[in-house]
Amino acid sequence: MSLGDVKEQLRGSRTEAKNAAKLIQVQFERVRNGGTTSVALRALKYELNILRQLCCALQENFHQHADIYCDIAADMLPHVAPHLPQPDYWVNHLMSLQYIHHALCREQTIKQCQRFYELINAQSCQMQNKSEYKYYIDIHIRHVYFFGHQLGKQSAASEAKAQLCQALQALGKLLENMLQLKAEQNEGYSELMGELNQLLGKRSIGYLKNLASLPLTAMNRLWKPLFKLIACNGGTTDQLNAQFSEYLSALLALLQLDDNVWQLQQSEAQAQTPLSLQLLHSCRELYKNQTAQNNVLQLLYNYLKLLNTQSADLKRSYIDLAKKFVHFFEHKAVSHVQEQWYLDFLFVLVRVQKHLHQIDNKVPSLERFWQCLGGQDSATAYAAHFELLQCLTSRVMKIGRGSPLAASCSGNDASCPSVLKHCVFTLGCCATVAYSSWQPEAQATLPKASQLCLASIIHYAIDVAKVTKCLTPNSSELVTFAWYLINMAEKVTTATQMYLLEHLLKPLQELRPLLSPPYAQQLVRRLFKASAHSSNPELSALLHGAYIVSMSCPARQFQQLCVFYHTPKNDTEQCLLELCEKSPLCSPLNATEKRKLYELDMLAVLANKKTPKLLQSLLRHCQTDYQMVLLGRQMRTDKRSAGQQIEELRVRLQRLGRKQQLTRLQQLILGHATVTKLLEAAETQKIKIHIKEMTEKTLEVLLVKYKLFDLTISSEMPLLELATTAIGAFESFYEQADAEPLSSDEALIDWEALIDDGIAAAMALSTMGYIPQADNAWLLLLRICRLLGDRFNYLRALSHFLPRYTQHALFDLPAEVSHAEQLLDELWPQLHAAHLLKRHHTTVLLCLCNLALYYARLDCVRHAQLLLLHAQRLRLEFEERAGKCDIIQLTIQTVRFRMCYQQRHCRSLARLPTALQQLDTLTESVRSFTCISSMDNGALILLLGDMVRDTTECTANRLSELPNFSNSLLQLLLQSGLVLRAVELLISWLWTNLRMECLDKAHSKLRLIEHFLGMQPLLESRAALEQTSNKGSLTLAPMDAQSKHMTELVGKMLVMQLEQSGACVEPIRKQQQLTMSSPRRELPLPSARPKLQRYVSLDMQQSHPMLRSSVQLQCIYFMAGCLHARLYFLNREHEQLDDFYALANAWLQQNAARGNALGHMLLVLHIYQANYLRARRRQQQAIELTETALKLAGSEQLQQRIDVNYRYNLLLQLRTAQLELEPPSKPQNPRRALTFNISPEEKLPRPVRKVATASKKPAKFAIYTEDVRPASSTTSSSSSSSSSENASSPERKSTKSKSPKRLDLNACQLIDIIDLSDDETEAVVQLQPAKSTSALSTRSTRTRAQRQPDTLVAPLRRTATAPNPLSAEATPKTIGTRARARRQNTAEQPTTTTTATPKVDSVSSRRRHRN
């Protein structure tokens, strides 16, 4: 068969390939047994031809017959040998073997590869010359490389390891044969290291790691002959210079291999010299004649040897060696800087440094070196190390070209043009690793010069990182560098360590954009932590600000901002944005980021550190109008900063709002700006008035002294408009939330500021007394606080409604009360929590008190008392409130007072003191008031305003005087310019003056009211009064002796009467001695008198728009008119009263809301009108009016919030009018005089009895008594108060005694007493003296009750019982008068009084019967 047939059969089917193999075997045996001298050559040629055919077949991918090919090779290889005369045949033979082995090194033919490699190793290594070793080396290296990768596979690991060991042993044998051949031929292997670098220097780290896992015994069979061969290998200078880089490349590979061996086989590795040192030792022998190369190899050998040894003198040796390197580079290497071997050595030394610092290794093999280098006295060694790194950095930066041995790009880009930059960056990483791995205690000992050296190295690394394109945020080199920088900052514990970082801040700012966000944020965070050890507070603040800016979570940013402003060292007066402009590490921010950061910064400043300079810094950097108004809220005391800007903004928004609808954000801005203007205007109008000047007689003088002529209701309207505008803007912002949502990108809404300003506006409305507008404001706050979950402000808003309403037209008050009770159940057990302030305590306790009043008006009296008791007990748990009269104690007393005098069910309040006793306690509590929380003063003004109204109603219906706190309240109101509240107080005061018939004082109050209401200026009123006084003083006649005597007589009788009355002084109006013969002052002419109609028919064209639309203000005018009409009635001036009452009734019928707004004053109007009708003999009209008023008083609308005595007064009015319309048929008998306050029902006819025998007992006048039991207030107080309301006003006429002699007060004579009529023309029965006898005088000292046992006796009081200790403690008894003291002493005795029919026509009783 020809060669061509064999070729076809080898590429054919498997059977054909087997047939070809048999045929080849037969033919090869035939050739080998030819018997000629050329048999060996012919066999070699035949074998070479067959190997070529196998190479061609494998090249054409016929690997399925690889086992047959190996059989063919196995038959021929043992029988061929080199032919010396023709060496090319053997070379071709080796080339064919090399090719076949390469072709079989694949996954499909791995078994055949192993078999073929074993066939090659089974033959002896026959080399004819030094060049043939390359083919053997290539085969072995190829086999090691292929099975080195197979070693990573677990399924073939053991078999691959065996093959690698076999290959290394075969390679060692080859090197031994080469040593033998070199000894025979004396020729060097100049290219040997380049061939071996195919196995070592040009392979990956993973491949070298696989080799390191082989047994050291197998590896040593390769390295020992290799190092011997290198040491004895020679060559020319050019050859050695050319091979220098190859040796250095092998050195780098062996360094890596040593490291891997140390990690995998540490115990075995420690027992032998590292391979890298053995290589350097052989290279020193090789380059012993090359001085320059020998020097660098010697330095490198000593350096690596020092790294792998442990000695006590390591630090000193390292310092000396580092100095030798520096000396070499600065002096000896100057002449070689352009030579390639020098560049290669320089880059190798850089990579040795990288290997030394173990940047790429997770398990450092040179840890022993760093342990020996560190410890005590290591600062000098580290300083030498940093000096060496700086020297290398400076030399690398001066290199003009690169080297293949330079550190490769992290992206394994062979074409990376930044090789030199990578080297500089690597040295910077090495310096960072060395310093960060050093002990923190030792870092503090590094000299500042060495710190600057280290800083320069890192600075160079950052400079090249900025311009190196392949250093991306995700590159391993940059990530490693950033990690060690973070570690450096983390270990800072002293100011010395911080000194280094201070010099790195500017370079780190340039590095920050190159880092990924997590590493950049972590770096800034560690620098901020390290700044705690800095001696520069400003730098610490800058770094803290940079850290806050680097955060991405707004919640964490705000938290850190609070920490920033609470830091004791931080005394900066600059906002965060201003600090960012100076900070060395703050990244640039876009407009959106700046706005969000500014809003967070502003919120943190407002919550933690509101210093003027810091607020001004924020104001300089504000970006929106909303931010400006939020700052303006905090700078309201500094008008120069933002006041003008905010006012201009408010005016601009108001003008814009007239043209178009404002957006939600604009409405919010307008609301804040308006509140700022409101508070500024309220503060501007405040004045200072001394309390000593606030007396009832000098009020008009006070207004003139302080020039309060412009203080009228019109002057208060701008404040009212500002407050209502602000609330309207806030309401529009709240109501349009769904229609116009706001994102956080537009504005970060400060709801706390909105609630605070809303409360400010609502408090302004409440303090000024405009209740409808205040209701709208507090209702808005109620809804907002419930939506936001602001529990305390929700309870504060609800507390506005609880004392005033049980139902409200604008919202479901019972549902809100139910929700508030749930909040109170949650809050009151937590009141002692540390985070709660005193105002929070006040809010909860006030809500409990007001809730008690709410339930009391719903007739849930017991529940109300329990709530008050609970509030009292909670109050006593706070040390700062115990023993003091705070707003809570005052409110509890006020609620109990209201419950007492407004309660219809007396038995439920049986153990409470009477209303007048509680009123004395309230007076003392106001005098001793103590402010505890920030909201107490505002709550006190509101409480006093309501208290004046309630106490006036109570005392007026009980014939008592106003408590003493009116002066103090009026002082506060006038100082604050609160006109409407002042008018309400003056109206209450006027009511009391009219009730006490102090007409001069009433005239004074009326002039003040008219001035404040803008009806008549005070100066005009006083001028008219002076003219009238001057004219009236001319008509006064001198008092004769008899008139003086009568005056003294009446005065003594009144004194005796008051002394004998015991405990009944307080319910009776304090008496005044009157001049009997003094005529009335002449009143102005009817044409000059003010018209009452002006109080009802207001000039709507000239009045303020708020007045035209405000029912409350109209009712204020109306009440003033009612009291003015009462003053006319007391002065017996009836000309305008008919028209006024007709207009009043028509005015009330026009709008039902007016009657609701008047409240109890509507009943007072009916009582006054009934008095007038009775005085005009219109009893039937009076009866009809009184019956209507009784129905009104019993309605659900009024009965829950008025004095209970109104009903009794109206009943007495009705009964009196009925008696006057149908007088009793029986004549009235004379009775003893000086029996006062006999109601119409008690005026029963009695038979006249003869005068009894004389008695030595003194005269005793028992009118009625009043004990401490509160349940009886509905009888005696009503009877006493009603007695002053049930009679018409008669004409005052002087009474003269018919006898010219002086009367003997020791002999009281029996006189006839008749009831005074309302008709002025009715004849007045004068006092008729009876027969004067001594016995009669003696007997006359006894009362009718003593002389007539069958007289009807009516007990007015139940026996007083011991008061409740809790209620007594909550409402202590404060005795205001001497009579009150007597009443307490006689409280245990039940008192009776007799009913009498005749009326006494005495001077002392005439004023009381006028009502």
From Swiss-Prot:
Compartments (UniProt record): Cytoplasm
What Gene Ontology cellular component terms go with this record? cytoplasm
Q: Where is this region: Separase cleavage-site?
A: 1065-1071
Would the keyword Metal-binding turn up in this protein's UniProt record?
no
Q: Which UniProt keywords apply?
A: Cell cycle, Cell division, Cytoplasm, Developmental protein, Mitosis
Which stretches of sequence are listed as region Disordered? Answer: 1221-1240, 1268-1301, 1330-1411
Q: Which domain of life is it from?
A: Eukaryota
Bias-annotated ranges (Low complexity): 1270-1289, 1386-1398
GO BP terms: namely: cell division; Malpighian tubule morphogenesis; mitotic sister chromatid segregation
- What is known about its subunit structure? Interacts with pim and Sse. Cleavage of thr contributes to inactivation of Sse.
- Biological function: Required specifically for chromosome disjunction during all mitoses; maternally provided protein is sufficient until mitosis 14 then zygotic protein is required. Involved in formation and/or maintenance of epithelial structures: bud extension during Malpighian tubule development, and foregut and hindgut morphogenesis.
Q: What is this protein called?
A: Protein three rows
Q: What is the lineage of its organism?
A: Eukaryota, Metazoa, Ecdysozoa, Arthropoda, Hexapoda
Q: Which gene encodes it?
A: thr
